Amino acid sequence: MGLTKSDLFTREQNDLANMAKAIAHPARIAILQYLVKKNACVTGDLVEELGLAQATTSQHLKELKNAGIIQGTVEGASVCYCIDPKVWKHYKNVFHTFFGEVKIEDSTCC
C-alpha cells in the first residue's frame, strides 16, 4: 500500500492546509467577519446578511463548524452560531507563526 498525499507532508503542514481550506471561501470569510462583528450568538440573520440561499449558508456553516472555528447550539427551532474563542486564537497563532517564519526582504523574486 502506497503513501497518501498527506503522508508526504508533516503534521503541521497538513494541519495548516486544513485550516486554510476551512476558511478559503469568500462566504466563510464573510460569515466569520459577521460573527466577529456581532460578538454574540447569531441565528437566522446570516442568510439575509449574506444574500445566499439557506442551503448554501448552512453548508458553509457546517464546514466552519467541522473545522471547530465556530460553535453551534440549538435554541428551539434554530441554531445559534458564534466564534469558538479558543480555536480562533489557535488559528491566529498558527497563521501568525507561518507568516512570521519567512523573512522576506523588499524583493527576493526574479
Task: Give each language-model segment a name.
Residues 1-15, 37, 85-110:
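Amphipathic alpha-helical dimerization/coiled-coil segments
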